[in-house]
Amino acid sequence: DWILDTFLGSGTSIIEAKRLGRNAIGIELQKNVIQIAKDNINKEFNKFNVKYEIIQSDCTELNYIKELKKFGISKVQFVIMHPPYWDIIKFSEDENDLSNCKSLKDFLNSIGKLIDATTPILEKGRYLAFVIGDKYSAGEWIPLGFYCMQEIQKRNYKLKSIIVKNFDETKGKMNQKELWRYRALVGGFYIFKHEYIFLFKKV
């Protein structure tokens, strides 16, 4: 089996692939993040001798068919996507970084473009996991997760499950739980403590 992670980040998906004996390809835009991922991945013993590769690229523009040919394969058996939650946290100055999308429409168009690029190389009947949270801005809840879900459902995917993952702290609120609670009470807004894992089957 081969898995594809289009937003590799710190390398967790490849670490888990090594533990499970699955070959893996990770895509990451930022060079400095790739080095962090490599350091993390190298700490994990490769007892199953899995193959894995990290590619520095804009995941929405990559020629996936060409990249897979390098490994002698034409399909992957699982795809995971954990994109930036639009502009909640700005990860870089790169204009290709999804956290720099100027509007919700631009962000969703980029997600749709990525789904279109990866759908042909996901084996039929296999699964796509999409991890995303919502956004709260100017007194309004923006259901980012469900907007992305709808973009994916426009393609050849059937929604199989929605897993809600609870968490108490995020990067943006690290060690500031009481401060953010106070801000929420005074400002009249909601503190997010969850994100979604949407599980889709390619049909």
Identify the meaning behind each predicted range.
Residues 1-203:
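Class I S-adenosyl-L-methionine-dependent methyltransferase catalytic core
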